[in-house]
Amino acid sequence: MSGKERVVFLDRAAFTADDLPIPSFDHNWSEYPETDTADIVPRLFWATIAITHATPVDAEAIGQLHKLTRIVVTGPAMVDVDACGARGIAVRNLTAGEAPEQTLVGLLEMLVDETRR
């Protein structure tokens, strides 16, 4: 993969500013306090990595997101893993009890590293 990753956090309001430091890898970062269903595709259209806490990402949306390669789920969001699998999109969930400030950034950096190998 070449160029910067485009990371979009669909519902950042679930975390305080100190909870989730922005990752160190080369990227463009966009975040929204919350995202309505009608805004999922427009917000993720150019994204390579999506982060969602409670915003569901269904098969219909996934079918329209041709740049998306990874989804990180930090909470109860419903993501259609079958649709993701069919499109080659990796889905990773943070395990309950993990410290989000450590695991989210670490997970994002690991996913980017895996993709660049």
Predicted features and spans:
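Phosphate/diphosphate ligand-binding glycine-rich loop within oxidoreductases
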Residues: 48-117
